[in-house]
Amino acid sequence: MLRKEIEDTSCALLCYMFLGYYACSNNILKQYIAMMFVMTAYLNYNQKKYIKFVILSILAFAFHYSAIFIIFIMCFIKKLQPSFSKYWLSILGGGCASLILNQILSLIIKLVPSASGYDVYINWRRSGQFRLIVAVIGMLITYMILVYFIIKYKENIKLVSERRYNEIIFLIVGLGINTISIKMWIINRVAIYFYQFIILILPTMFEGMDINKRKKIKTYLYLLMFIYMIFSSIFLGENEYYSYNTVFSGDIPISDVQYNMIHGWGK
């Protein structure tokens, strides 16, 4: 898929590794499979391959409940033009929404009864853990810098690929969701549905630059992503089944199933 969409596949691979998508494929496997189907579904929708789009959307939904809403949002917002005003509005809006997050989630659960299984997260004690809050803030800062550069050079992207240009809005939406998740870290997993398009967008941005500028900015951004990879391994180092605890979490590594049973989240 990557070879069809971009030329600089080595850059895409580094984004995949350094920004934690490989880690996601090991840790939250069901959602990661849904994420892949979401991306491929959207790409087929963009190419007007509607039968494939429907099939891939159903497969995404089969692996993770949230996928169908993400696909709908992507198709709805894809014509919005990326800009710095939307960039700041997304972050500010996310910050304001986080203040009334519990009320918003309660309303969604009332409107969509089938989502009632998620009400356990409203008062989930792990949302207040210091390391998880730091992890979410670290991700937000990293993507704020990356998306800032992408918007700055958006015209370069547009010259190379109109489709990649239109996908910048997904990163901006991801920033808003990422900001909300400071209050409840688990929502951060929704942000990565939108963030994953950076794997396609960043190589396209570099492709539209002159050689000297490309080399300089690549060095800075690769270093940033590498630091983020180490940072996220320390502060967000957990697995769907087994926790990768560090000196910052301070607990003996136990399975999340055991953790939930100990703290009253098991049935």
Model regions: which residues?
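Alpha-helical transmembrane segments and terminal signal-anchor/GPI-anchor hydrophobic tails
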Residues: M74-F194, F235-Q258
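Signature aromatic-anchored transmembrane alpha helix within multi-pass, membrane-resident enzymes
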Residues: W88-G93, D210-F231
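Membrane-interface transmembrane helices that cradle and orient dolichyl/undecaprenyl
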Residues: V38-I51
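Short acidic/glycine- and proline-prone juxtamembrane loop motifs at membrane-interface regions
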Residues: N26-Y32
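Transmembrane-helix signature of polytopic, membrane-embedded enzymes
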Residues: L2-L19
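Membrane-interface alpha helices of multi-pass inner-membrane proteins
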Residues: G20-C24, K52-F76, L175-N178
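Hydrophobic transmembrane alpha-helices and their immediate junctions
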Residues: I192-K216
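Transmembrane-helix signature of membrane-embedded glycosylation machinery that interfaces
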Residues: M1-E7, Y45, F206
